[in-house]
C-alpha cells in the first residue's frame, strides 16, 4: 500500500531516516512548519504536524491528520478535514516535561534561586537579607 506522508515536525536526520525505514513503501516529504507549501499538503494522504488550516482545508483526500499539539480544535471544525479522516493528537506527550518544569520552578522559588541568579548576573556577591522578602 503506497501512501504519501507530509511531515511538518522538527525532526533531525536520524529521526527522518528511522521514519522512512519503518514504512519503506510510503513516500515522505519533510517540511519545516514555517515552510509548508500548499502543493505539499494537497499531495499528502497523511499529514503529521500542524500544517496551516487554510491549506489542510483544500485537501479532500487526507486519510490521517496527526496534530503535534494536544488540542487540534481548529482542524476539527466542519469542512476542514474530510469526514472519514482519522485525527490523532499529542495528548499526554508533554506531561512529564511540564511536570518537571513545574517542579524546577517551584524549587527555584522556594530556594530564592532567581534572586541569587539576578545578583550573580549583576556581579553582586553580598548576602541577600531574605527576612525582608518572606
State where each predicted segment sits.
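Arginine residue identity/basic-tract feature
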Residues: 16, 29, 57, 117-119, ...
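Single conserved hydrophobic/aromatic residue that forms the stacking wall/gate
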Residues: 65, 133-134
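An N-terminal-biased, well-structured beta-alpha scaffold segment characteristic
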Residues: 1-88
Amino acid at each position: 500500500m503506497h501512501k504519501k506522508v507530509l511531515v511538518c515536525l522538527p525532526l533531525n536526520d536520524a529521526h527522518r531516516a528511522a521514519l522512512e525505514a519503518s514504512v519503506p513503501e510510503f513516500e515522505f516529504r519533510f517540511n519545516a512548519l514555517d515552510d509548508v507549501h500548499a502543493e505539499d499538503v494537497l499531495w499528502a494522504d497523511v499529514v503529521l504536524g500542524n500544517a496551516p488550516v487554510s491549506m489542510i482545508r483544500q485537501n479532500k483526500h487526507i486519510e490521517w491528520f496527526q496534530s503535534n499539539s494536544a488540542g487540534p480544535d481548529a482542524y476539527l471544525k466542519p469542512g476542514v478535514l474530510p469526514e472519514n479522516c482519522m485525527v490523532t493528537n499529542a495528548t499526554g506527550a508533554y506531561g512529564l516535561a511540564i511536570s518537571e518544569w513545574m517542579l524546577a520552578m517551584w524549587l527555584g522559588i522556594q530556594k530564592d534561586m532567581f534572586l541569587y541568579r539576578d545578583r550573580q548576573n549583576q556581579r553582586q556577591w553580598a548576602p541577600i537579607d531574605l527576612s525582608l522578602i518572606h
